[in-house]
């Protein structure tokens, strides 16, 4: 699992989003750059008496509200939002990797059972051919076995293609190149008891990545509502300037005057009070609140449904093992003893062995279904997921 968390390209992109949000947050909420103002005028085009003036000034805009603080707050929450998105993607990635691994493990065991079925039916076909030569069996029975054998071999080919697709998906999740082989070494383990499955509530819910993601969006919406109200007042402008003027004064002629001044520009919210943005932000805040409630209900219901399905499937698998599996194993033991005593022929032994393999396959499907439900439950509750130590992955470059 560590390989997937390290190499998966989607997670790399999510981590880059955090870096981007952090960089934006570092410089958010700063004053606008000051403006340098230069001016020059003369009477050259009119009286041409040599009169002129020069002006240089600096203007800086300052907010009259807490707009900059709100901008810094929104930017900081956006970092939390990016981190929650990363954790949520990690949760889903772990689910997908475990699901793919579980599927491949199940397909491997299913293939092993089918290989056993092929060997059994091939031996049975040889047995029937010998009996046909002795006139003790019909070719109809042999044809039925050969048709069944062909069907099993076709199923093996379908399983192989399905396994190849699952391996390709797993390779992508692990961030591996196409030339790297991935092999599932451990077999599917049957549970002896269900893990403790607590309801998703309280702190567990609040720490869920998807809940935190939506909660961060709600927090941003609240801050943006406050920001919209703060934007009713535009920034005031403060100007500091120096002016020099040369003008004609009778009767002394050209004279020079210098001025130093301060100017203030105060915008008045008489026409545009940002009411549209204020109303929109209020509705957006309400919308995110509804979405947060919807996420809360969905997460709780999904966790509860998966918990009930896990309990029902576990009881079904345990009952199936107790009844059908135990019964067919006893039948197999009895038929072998009967064959050793000469009470039945080898054909009956083959048929019971085939039934035994079919029952084992059905039992395998139940355990696979249960394991998949548990994987979904751990992802739905964002529980601490086990690593793949029980399903070792070995990979090597061809």
Each model region followed by its residue ranges:
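Bacterial Sec-pathway N-terminal export signals of envelope proteins
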Residues: 1-40, 62, 70, 136-138, ...
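Small/polar (Gly/Ser/Thr/Ala-rich) solvent-exposed segments
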Residues: 12, 31-51, 61-88, 212, ...
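Amphipathic alpha-helical coiled-coil segments
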Residues: 13-25, 89, 93-114, 123, ...
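Outer-membrane beta-barrel domain signature
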Residues: 48, 53-54, 143, 157, ...
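Transmembrane beta-barrel architecture of outer-membrane proteins
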Residues: 53, 99, 144, 235, ...
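Residues on the lipid-exposed face of transmembrane beta-strands in outer-membrane beta-barrel proteins
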Residues: 56-60, 170, 262-266
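Short, charged, amphipathic alpha-helical segments
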Residues: 73-76, 139-148, 346-354
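Periplasmic alpha-helical coiled-coil/stalk elements that build and connect Gram-negative outer-membrane
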Residues: 84-207, 306-309, 313, 356
